Amino acid sequence: MIFSNAVFHWIDADKQEKLIENIAANLKIGGQLICEFGGKGCAESVHASLERGFAKRGLEYPRVFYFPTVGEYAPILEKYGFRVEYAVLFDRPTVQKTENGLEDWIRMFNKKPFEGMDEALVQEIIDETVEELRDQLFVDGKWIVDYVRIRFKVRKFR
């Protein structure tokens, strides 16, 4: 059995097949892969707001995470000899621990789009995003990021 939590969405879309091929190579017939990772729409309000902030400045916002649907990912699993026994895409609003939770989340998990950018500009874009999303994601003194997760339980059959 191979178990994975919150890893696959960090791997580029063009490397997903290689990932699954390698997992399949390391399981015997009947072996299971159980995984959960970011699914289509994960943190979309944050990414959309950042994208608007970049565009306002004539910059392109790179979407660096891979967030598929069940329908997009199941064929990859099937191609490498897995039978999908369970698959679900679901909302999982995720509370951030501090009042600065959204800024902290952006700085911790979404650094790549800001690489090479002047820190003052980074802060300006983040501040705009925080203010734009405050009414939507700041609830009862806590930031709640709009996570969407995808979960699979698959079994190798060939």
Label for each model-derived stretch:
Residues 3:
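A conserved beta-strand element that flanks and buttresses the S-adenosyl-L-methionine
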Residues 8-9, 40:
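Active-site beta-alpha loop architecture of Rossmann-like, nucleotide-cofactor-dependent enzymes
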Residues 9-11, 26:
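A short His-aromatic
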Residues 17-32:
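A short glycine-rich, Lys/Arg-flanked "PGG" loop and its adjoining helix->strand segment in the class I
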Residues 32-59:
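Conserved class I S-adenosyl-L-methionine
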Residues 65-80:
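Short alpha-helix
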Residues 85-140:
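C-terminal helical/coil "lid" or tail adjacent to the Rossmann-like core of SAM-dependent
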Residues 103-107, 149-158:
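Core SAM-dependent methyltransferase catalytic element
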